[in-house]
């Protein structure tokens, strides 16, 4: 048996994580498949130890990685772990140099270009042969496809980038049994909350990605619908200059600039800061991703049982002039597990990489 050496490069705390889970353990045991490969296998991801504290999704991902590692003692699993923002920069640099890790997180927007450059292994047949294939929501594959080919394993159970977390007791006092389904009603409620010195909805865009990922991704769909999105990613005519998408931008500008719904410092604070406004009671609601949801859930469960028992969840409210799915949300993940195309030259190593990808996105993580 080869002596294993672990190299964990942890840089800063991550700002997002795959999936949502309130448990800090694998949902099912990792499949201990017999693998012929004996050697090093590298994975690059952004689930830092700091991020895993209070984030069930991040903690679960790390737990499954550790379980897979322990189940395969002849394989040295080398983890290169960076913060989310650092990860995006580093993975782009490695792609430009043609030196991607064996296994890594693929962002949907990079799929087509990197596939055309021959950097990504076509996983279509491997995914179809996966023991978990029938359990996948086929829509999760869309951002990671080029034509009919699939280049990433999405998590079996997707999270959401856009969830409203609200204090049911506070909204009850404002006259609402549930969180409003329209922005018009949210704006009306803000009059009450402002009189109480409470922020209606906390939001943080300090990282300059939250407004797009956690808000516009869902708001835009309320105006454009799913067909426009598919046309955009397939480059079949849809454009960000289309009237219906411009209408979504106009509504977003109105909500953040012309109303008093959100905290005034939304563009200066991060999602981590904004969710603390909700936790402390300074805000009656918060909008963020499933990673924020799991952090809030865990924090309140430990420190404030009353507020924890009053947690409510809702989808993004519907704008008055939007005509598409009023209850839609941004389901799925911004990343999938991808494999370096170079591994095709080493069948045993490739089999190990496929096994790893299947397990860290399958039932053990879901």
Name these PLM-found stretches:
Residues 3-14, 23-116, 132, 348:
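Conserved N-terminal structural module of periplasmic/extracytoplasmic solute-binding proteins
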Residues 28-32, 108-163, 187, 193, ...:
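Hinge/lid segment of periplasmic solute-binding proteins
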Residues 71-81, 99, 173-178, 254-269, ...:
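A local structural motif
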Residues 81-90, 109, 181-188, 264-279:
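Short helix-initiation/N-cap motifs at beta->coil->alpha
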Residues 124-136, 142, 222-247, 300-306, ...:
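Short, solvent-exposed loop/beta-turn-alpha elements that line the ligand-binding surface or hinge
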Residues 146-157, 162, 187-237:
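Extracytoplasmic/periplasmic solute-binding protein
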Residues 174, 259, 301-366:
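Extracytoplasmic/periplasmic substrate-recognition and gating elements
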Residues 190, 234-266:
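Glycine-centered hinge/linker elements that transmit conformational signals in sensory
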